[in-house]
């Protein structure tokens, strides 16, 4: 049976660790927080991130990275997008070339505007990378609620290995070779979810959200295709599927942050109240720069940028979006 090491014992990393542990896989969870490590190893819980769960005994938490990595055939990057590069640097010289890196973070690197698999490839060029993505809230995965994701890689053999690793009766995995499309969909949908939350916070209705999600889907496809993704990917699980769940669920950090912003809070206040990383805010800045560079029209991203970084009022920004020049509906 395989051994899987997770870098990060947050909500999603812990949930996937539980899933694998219940399948009989040996799992190590590396984290810096000694309270989290103690809670997992002593109490078989991780109450800091997910309440009311029991962690199997074959899941062990470590503060020492070398111990966590010992014997691992797979390493799962379960850390926020802005620390992916640091995490990979920490892996240098500690893992063999045949260890498969599985990334579950969704976002883009601030400053370089690189996709996360590109960052991983820069730091760990000899290791194959698989992106595991799709509509999946940790709160539901940890409870065994049926969930379906995509394992995407340039190495289809590696994607199939990850598919076999995670598949069980309540966790279905498809494979996909469009890693660009999968990563772009997973990153941009967080911007649209922020905007959907703003609509909810202002008090707009279902009509508004349906329009925003649909036109948001067009933005995702537009920038994704421009960057080399396949059109069909954006209408699958990692595009439309992830967009739907992130824009509608109260588990969504991005939607919750958007609601608070729509109610008049600043981005900083919203992040503090949510209490966890809100990837859509970083993604908004990155994709605003990318769409300018690539010459792609992304009006929802434009408006989100004005609210998040230029101090525009949410209601005024929505008016700007609605009062743009008339045009034909198209992707």
From Swiss-Prot:
Where does the record say this protein resides?
Cytoplasm
Describe the family membership recorded for this protein in Swiss-Prot or TrEMBL. Answer: Belongs to the NAD-dependent glycerol-3-phosphate dehydrogenase family.
Q: Which Pfam families does the record match to this protein?
A: NAD_Gly3P_dh_C, NAD_Gly3P_dh_N
Question: What's its job?
Answer: Catalyzes the reduction of the glycolytic intermediate dihydroxyacetone phosphate (DHAP) to sn-glycerol 3-phosphate (G3P), the key precursor for phospholipid synthesis.
Q: Which reaction does it catalyse?
A: sn-glycerol 3-phosphate + NAD(+) = dihydroxyacetone phosphate + NADH + H(+); sn-glycerol 3-phosphate + NADP(+) = dihydroxyacetone phosphate + NADPH + H(+)
Q: Which residues form the active site?
A: 189
Biological process (GO) annotations held by this record are: carbohydrate metabolic process; glycerol-3-phosphate biosynthetic process; glycerol-3-phosphate catabolic process; glycerophospholipid metabolic process; phospholipid biosynthetic process
Q: State what protein this is by name.
A: Glycerol-3-phosphate dehydrogenase [NAD(P)+]
Q: Which UniProt keywords apply?
A: Cytoplasm, Lipid biosynthesis, Lipid metabolism, NAD, NADP, Nucleotide-binding, Oxidoreductase, Phospholipid biosynthesis, Phospholipid metabolism
Q: What is its EC number?
A: 1.1.1.94
Single GO MF descriptor:
glycerol-3-phosphate dehydrogenase [NAD(P)+] activity
Per the record, its GO cellular-component terms are: cytosol
Q: Name its species.
A: Clostridium perfringens (strain SM101 / Type A)
The record's Gene3D superfamilies line, in alphabetical order, gives: N-(1-d-carboxylethyl)-l-norvaline Dehydrogenase, domain 2 (1.10.1040.10), NAD(P)-binding Rossmann-like Domain (3.40.50.720)
């Amino acid at each position: 049976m395989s051994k899987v090491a997770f870098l990060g014992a947050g909500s999603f990393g812990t949930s996937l660790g539980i899933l694998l542990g219940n399948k009989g896989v040996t799992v190590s969870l590396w984290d810096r927080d000694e309270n989290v490590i103690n809670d997992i190893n002593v109490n078989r819980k991780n109450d800091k991130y997910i309440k009311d769960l029991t962690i199997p005994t074959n899941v062990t938490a470590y503060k020492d990275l070398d111990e966590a990595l010992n014997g691992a055939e797979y390493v799962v990057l379960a850390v926020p997008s802005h620390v992916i590069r640091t995490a990979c640097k920490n892996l240098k010289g500690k893992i063999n070339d045949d260890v498969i890196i599985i990334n579950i973070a969704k976002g883009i690197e601030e400053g370089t505007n690189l996709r996360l698999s590109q960052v991983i490839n820069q730091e760990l060029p000899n290791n194959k990378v698989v992106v595991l993505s799709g509509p999946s809230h940790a709160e539901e995965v940890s409870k065994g609620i049926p969930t379906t994701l995509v394992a995407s890689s340039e190495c289809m053999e590696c994607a199939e290995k990850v598919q076999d690793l995670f598949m069980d009766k309540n966790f279905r995995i498809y494979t996909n070779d469009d890693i660009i499309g999968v990563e772009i969909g997973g990153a941009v949908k967080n911007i649209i979810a922020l905007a959907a939350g703003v609509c909810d916070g202002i008090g707009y209705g279902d009509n508004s959200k349906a329009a925003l999600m649909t036109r948001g889907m067009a933005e995702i496809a537009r920038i994704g295709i421009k960057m080399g993704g396949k059109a069909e990917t954006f209408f699958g699980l990692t595009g439309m599927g992830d967009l739907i769940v992130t824009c509608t669920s109260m588990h969504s950090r991005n939607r919750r942050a958007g609601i608070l912003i729509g109610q008049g809070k600043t981005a900083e206040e919203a992040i503090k109240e949510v209490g966890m990383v809100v990837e859509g805010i970083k993604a908004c800045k990155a994709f605003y720069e990318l769409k300018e560079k690539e010459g792609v029209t992304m009006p929802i991203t434009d408006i989100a940028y004005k609210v998040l970084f230029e101090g525009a009022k949410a209601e005024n920004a929505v008016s700007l979006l609605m009062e743009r020049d008339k045009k034909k509906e198209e992707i």
